[in-house]
Structures are given as C-alpha cells and as structure tokens.
Amino acid sequence: MNPKHWGRAVWTIIFIVLSQAGLDGNIEACKRKLYTIVSTLPCPACRRHATIAIEDNNVMSSDDLNYIYYFFIRLFNNLAFDPKYAIDVSKVKPL
C-alpha cells in the first residue's frame, strides 16, 4: 500500500503519542504504542525499514523521551519525499 495515502496520518499519530508521553511521563506505554504502530504499517518495506531503524538505534531500551522524540523526527526527515515537509530540528523544543 502506498505511503502517500496513509503516511501523514500515521506520522501525526506518532507525534501525538510522543507528545502525550511528554505530558503524562509514561515512556514505557509510549514505546509500546509506537512499536505497535510501526510494526503494523500497511507497507511491508516501510514496516521493515522502521523496525530495523528502531532496533539499530536502541529506541525500545531508551528511557529518554527526547532521544525517542528526536529519533522519530530524524526518521521522518529521512523519509520525507519533499524537503519542504522536513522538520527543522533547531526549532523543535524538547518534550
């Protein structure tokens, strides 16, 4: 399934989950939700790419919400088809 049809919605959900963890402080629940989202992406290649990136960067073992947050920002920027959608990390406030 083509990510252009569902990609923005999924990224919105990912960043909502991260923002909620910034408010409630439940990093473990946040990581479980994020892994569930990523491991059920409708595109097999996207699913594989994202889970490998999560594993390679030890996201699931991190207790630092901002590490996880900035990881997903970098992943988003690496996958953005159009540079105009890239997130300027210098303008992002830590959670």
UniProtKB/Swiss-Prot annotation:
Record's protein name: Probable FAD-linked sulfhydryl oxidase OPG072
Originating organism: Monkeypox virus
Source organism phylogeny: Viruses, Varidnaviria, Bamfordvirae, Nucleocytoviricota, Pokkesviricetes
Domain ERV/ALR sulfhydryl oxidase: start-end pairs: 1-95
InterPro entries on file: ERV/ALR_sulphydryl_oxid_sf (IPR036774), ERV/ALR_sulphydryl_oxidase (IPR017905), Sulphydryl_Oase_FAD-link_ERV1 (IPR006890)
Entry EC no(s): 1.8.3.2
Catalytic activity: 2 R'C(R)SH + O2 = R'C(R)S-S(R)CR' + H2O2
Entry cofactors: FAD
Assembly and binders: Interacts with OPG128; this interaction involves formation of a transient disulfide-bonded intermediate, allowing disulfide bond transfer.
